[in-house]
Amino acid sequence: MKKTRILGLLFAVVLCIVGCGSSAEIKVDTLSISGNGAATYTIISDFSEPYYNLEELKSMAQKEVEAYGTGVQISSAEVTDGVLKFQYTFDSLSHYSRFMETSCYQGTVAAALANGYKADTKLTSAKGGSLTMSDSSIRERNLFIWNEEVAVRCDGSVVCYSENLSLSGKTDVQPKEGSVGPYYVVYK
């Protein structure tokens, strides 16, 4: 079942999304990934119109979660100063992929290369400079690859990232405006 109904509603109310500030506060739609494979997807959206109803939105989202089954929960839904912060928690990235009808990869750089990902993918170092996926210094590092235009918060420091991303904090990357995936981030 397409998730476009709920996501369409959430994104339809977006008037303005601001850039990420400190790594502690999420200010844009962000997928937070953890080393154990779990993930939290945070949606940030304008919710200031008087006809917006948080309870209706939560009810609609809960129906989508129940239709999906186990592996996904609504962890929070709140409005503060006209801004909606809505979070889904996923037991695994495979649940995230199926629920959101997208694809992603989490593993080591070496495993990604063994699975056919391109060795010549250009990456930007968090410390400056450039390298490719075949660089031996990152082969055993964690890698996350995704296709959606959504910021990602890693559970470790960013080492390098694809050229269609920008570093927005020690653990955060964000797609550049107008960019398309796939997006790559290598982290400790």
Locations of regions flagged by a protein language model:
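Positively charged n-region of N-terminal signal peptides that target proteins for export
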Residues: M1-F11
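Bacterial signal peptide processing site
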Residues: G21-S23
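N-terminal Sec/ER secretory leader and immediately downstream segment
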Residues: E25-T80
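C-terminal motif of bacterial Sec signal peptides marking the signal peptidase cleavage site
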Residues: C16-G19
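Generic hydrophobic, helix-prone segments enriched in Leu/Val/Ile
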Residues: M1-K3, K58, V158-V159, V185
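Short linear motifs at secondary-structure transitions and domain/linker junctions
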Residues: G8, S59-E66, V158-N164
